[in-house]
């Protein structure tokens, strides 16, 4: 039962201990340079895995990506004990992800994980326009 719904107070925010960091990359069926849609048939699919790695997706080998809908084909999520480790884990996990037959934003996300501004936590919403 939710204690707050019973009228109990929440503990103060200061009592919450942060434990690690998660990163999510939204993999889309798009050209990684122009972000134009890339519909077509997936000829090969290798889903990464491992401790604290999660891939939420509906795709599979021989699946056809239609041109009519949202191009997102998966969410790749990793967790590790700190930001630098999470970035490294995401890069390695992205390199293990194989989606053949269509263009995807996988390589864009790999480049982001290697980008020194991103690694140094020095980025903003204008990142793509400066790319």
Predicted regions and their residues:
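Catalytic cores of soluble metabolic enzymes centered on carboxylation/carboxyl-transfer
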Residues: 2-131
């Amino acid at each position: 039962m939710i204690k707050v719904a019973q009228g109990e107070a929440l503990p103060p925010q200061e009592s919450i201990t942060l434990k690690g960091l998660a990163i999510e990359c939204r993999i889309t069926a798009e050209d990684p340079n122009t972000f134009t849609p890339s519909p077509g048939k997936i000829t090969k699919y290798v889903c990464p895995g491992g401790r604290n790695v999660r891939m939420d997706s509906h795709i599979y080998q021989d699946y056809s990506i239609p041109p009519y809908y949202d191009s997102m084909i998966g969410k790749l999520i990793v967790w590790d004990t700190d930001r630098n480790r999470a970035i490294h884990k995401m890069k390695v996990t992205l390199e293990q992800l194989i989606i053949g037959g269509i263009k995807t934003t996988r390589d864009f996300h790999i480049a982001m994980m290697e980008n020194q501004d991103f690694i140094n936590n020095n980025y903003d919403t204008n990142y793509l326009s400066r790319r």
